[in-house]
């Protein structure tokens, strides 16, 4: 079956920004041809890209909604697959897992607030995934909008080379359109059409000098990336528009430059040129290097080129529960084709699975298709897959690199209200924790039997509980949020574990001696087999490691997991008859417990990176409050009459901070908080936490 859209007419893009910079509104404004789509307003709770009830109520994006739309440029029809991602830090996993499947990203910046914290964090992720970018300075119609200030912030804060290919025609309530520095024409949107139509005019006299100045800057910046053009430029030869565009595209794909455009998505101004820039400057799927993975049968590295004739290979980047279709698995096809109803091989799980219906998505509406090909994105009904799984041709197996997600930093106890709720809850938590959201986990406390849910922040858990009620009709009682403490050690120690059990028949014998030492913070766990002379047979070495890991999960001081430890197994003994896997597991566990209590164990707590934006009048009160929360002020930055206070604060001290900040700043302050690192809890506080924890376990 021939593909509907040629691969060279396909673009896969993400829309990423800080919360409230206008991502969803921008996506809503991207028009489609052949479909009558009603434009929704985020401010009215009607945006179609924000389709979950919680998103409509809060005016923020929680999940990464996908939409396929079409754009015609110079008579050629293109398909643009767009992923609109959350700006709230509690849902940044949606941004990260989208990065792997995108060919380019449009970063939205507010012309008023400029470069904000979550944008910086997401920019670093884009660097890691080597994704080309375009910057769109939005909200040019707002009071305080300043294109030139934000352009400078992009250059300084993100340490990249931006190149303005437009400058604004007016600002704030005088914002009319943009000046195209390539064509040296002004584009003015007609208010009477609500921005649906525009006119191309000569640059007004009052803007000609600034336009010429910025065009020169644009040309200089672009030619610096191309030796041939630089030579022509230095020799004062004419550089054609086609040469400039070609060089800009190459520099964008190679991540040497970031084109900068501007507009007001809310007023529907600037979106059409943004789409043109996506078509002209972003890479085609066939421009990208082959994806690399591992053949599970041979262990050797293999690659797949973005061609339909290559063996099928796709990456599951998102899994969602749909109330009507069941599980939806969103995939990006890197090579080959997949037909509806055919079988695929889930190489990650070593399972053959049937792909039912294939759906082209527009937020929460959908269009059924019969085939998906290289470079395309779709949702598949019927697969039992999880985020990060590789789907492929069974005869040509490959496993692509899986994403690593941060551990949750906050937990909360939940209790079903009725027996009926109890029965449904385990099924829902299994889907949410294992497949749908890799940063959300559900566990059962082995001592109390309580169900604990774990996530990236208060809002994250609040949304999950709300979804249980709305989508599955499950009512739960919710406990207070709890901090995900951890434990570690400060010094080296040696420990011995010996497990001997004599019964009437065969006994049990395991004996292990280990040395433990602290690792740098965040390094996790290392196990070194340093056994010589066969004092412990090789088949029992993994048993010792398993026992050590089990003991680490149960903690030293208060039952919290132990992290950042190196364990060296260097001695022990065994019995020809009585030694067994379980005996050496117990020996390993006992050895770790023996060593750990001598290694100066300490309690660790999550430290959050907090950024508070407040009017100048309240800075003193804000800093005083952060200090009272054991915070360390890391710096301050002025943005007009707004001051940004940056601090490191223990998560345990940040519960309920939103209410306090509203009170301190008369509702005018805002803050963002994200995980930074783990650090030691001060001794007097640690003693209290340990005491309360142990009292809870004994009661």
Swiss-Prot record:
DNA repair is among the record's keywords: no
Keyword Isomerase set for record: no
Protein's UniProt name: Elongation factor G
GO cellular component: cytoplasm
HAMAP family, per the entry: EF_G_EF_2_B
PROSITE patterns hit by this protein: G_TR_1 (PS00301), G_TR_2 (PS51722)
Keywords: Cytoplasm, Elongation factor, GTP-binding, Nucleotide-binding, Protein biosynthesis
Function: Catalyzes the GTP-dependent ribosomal translocation step during translation elongation. During this step, the ribosome changes from the pre-translocational (PRE) to the post-translocational (POST) state as the newly formed A-site-bound peptidyl-tRNA and P-site-bound deacylated tRNA move to the P and E sites, respectively. Catalyzes the coordinated movement of the two tRNA molecules, the mRNA and conformational changes in the ribosome.
MF (Gene Ontology): GTP binding; GTPase activity; translation elongation factor activity
Gene behind this protein: fusA
BP term (GO), one: ribosome disassembly
Family the entry assigns: Belongs to the TRAFAC class translation factor GTPase superfamily. Classic translation factor GTPase family. EF-G/EF-2 subfamily.
Compartments, record wording: Cytoplasm
Every tr-type G domain range: 8-286
Principal localisation: cytoplasm
UniProt-annotated binding residues for GTP: 17-24, 84-88, 138-141
């Amino acid at each position: 079956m021939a593909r509907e859209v040629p691969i060279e007419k396909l673009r896969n893009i993400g829309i990423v920004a800080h919360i409230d910079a206008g991502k969803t509104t921008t996506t809503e404004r991207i028009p489609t041809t052949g479909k009558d789509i009603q434009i929704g307003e985020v401010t009215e709770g009607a945006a179609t890209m924000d389709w979950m009830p919680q998103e409509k109520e809060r005016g923020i994006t929680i999940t990464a909604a996908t939409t396929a739309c079409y754009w015609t440029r110079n008579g050629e029809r293109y398909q643009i697959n767009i992923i609109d991602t959350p700006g709230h830090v509690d849902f940044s996993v949606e941004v990260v897992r989208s990065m792997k499947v995108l060919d380019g990203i449009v970063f939205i910046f507010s012309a008023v607030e400029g470069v904000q914290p979550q944008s910086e964090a997401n920019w670093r992720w884009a660097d890691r995934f080597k994704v080309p970018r375009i910057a769109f300075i939005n909200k040019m119609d707002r009071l305080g909008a300043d294109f030139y200030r934000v352009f400078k912030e992009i250059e300084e804060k993100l340490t990249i080379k931006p190149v303005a290919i437009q400058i604004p025609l007016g600002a704030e309530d005088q914002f009319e359109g943009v000046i195209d520095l390539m064509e040296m024409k002004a584009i003015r949107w007609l208010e009477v059409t609500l921005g649906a139509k525009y006119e191309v005019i000569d640059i007004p006299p009052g803007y000609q000098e600034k336009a010429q100045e910025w065009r020169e800057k644009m040309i200089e910046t672009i030619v610096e990336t191309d030796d041939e053009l630089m030579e022509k430029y230095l020799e004062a030869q004419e550089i054609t528009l086609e040469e400039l565009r070609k060089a800009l595209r190459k520099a964008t794909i190679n991540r040497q430059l970031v084109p900068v455009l501007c507009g007001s998505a809310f007023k529907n101004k600037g979106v059409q040129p943004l789409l043109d820039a996506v078509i002209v400057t972003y890479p085609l799927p066939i421009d990208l290097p082959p994806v690399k993975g591992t053949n599970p049968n041979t262990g050797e590295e293999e690659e797949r080129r973005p061609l339909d004739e290559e063996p099928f290979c796709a990456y599951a980047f998102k899994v969602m529960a749909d109330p009507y279709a069941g599980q939806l698995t969103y995939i990006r096809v890197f090579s080959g084709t997949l037909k509806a109803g055919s079988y695929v091989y889930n190489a990650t799980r070593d399972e053959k699975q049937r792909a039912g219906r294939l759906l082209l998505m527009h937020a929460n509406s959908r269009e059924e298709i019969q085939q998906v090909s290289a470079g395309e994105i779709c949702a598949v009904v019927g697969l039992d897959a999880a985020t990060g799984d590789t789907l492929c041709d069974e005869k040509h197996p490959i496993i692509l690199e899986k994403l690593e997600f941060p551990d949750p930093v906050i937990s909360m106890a939940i209790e079903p209200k009725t027996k009926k709720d109890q029965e449904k809850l385990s099924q829902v938590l299994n889907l949410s924790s294992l497949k749908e959201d890799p940063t959300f986990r559900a566990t059962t406390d082995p001592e109390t039997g309580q169900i604990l849910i774990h996530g990236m922040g208060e809002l994250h858990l609040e949304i999950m509980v709300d979804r249980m009620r709305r989508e599955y009709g499950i009512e739960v009682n919710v406990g207070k949020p709890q901090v995900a403490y951890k434990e570690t050690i400060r010094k080296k120690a040696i420990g011995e574990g010996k497990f001997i059990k004599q019964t009437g028949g065969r006994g049990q014998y395991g004996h292990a001696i280990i040395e433990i030492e602290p690792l740098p913070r965040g390094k996790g766990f290392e196990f070194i087999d340093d056994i010589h002379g066969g004092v412990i047979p090789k088949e029992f070495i993994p048993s010792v490691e398993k026992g050590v890991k089990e003991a680490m999960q149960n903690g030293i001081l208060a039952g919290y997991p132990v992290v950042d430890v190196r364990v060296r197994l260097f001695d022990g003994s065994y019995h020809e008859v009585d030694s067994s896997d379980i005996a050496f597991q117990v020996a390993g566990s006992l050895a770790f417990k023996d060593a750990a209590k001598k290694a100066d164990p300490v309690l660790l707590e999550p430290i959050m990176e907090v950024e508070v934006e407040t009017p100048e009048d309240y800075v003193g009160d804000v800093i005083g409050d952060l200090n009272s929360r054991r915070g360390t002020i890391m710096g301050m930055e002025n943005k007009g009459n707004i001051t940004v206070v940056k601090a490191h604060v223990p998560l345990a001290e940040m519960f309920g901070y939103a209410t306090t900040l509203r009170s301190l700043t008369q509702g005018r302050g805002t803050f963002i908080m994200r995980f930074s690192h783990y650090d030691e809890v001060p001794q007097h506080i640690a003693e209290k936490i340990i005491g309360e924890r142990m009292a809870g376990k004994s009661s």
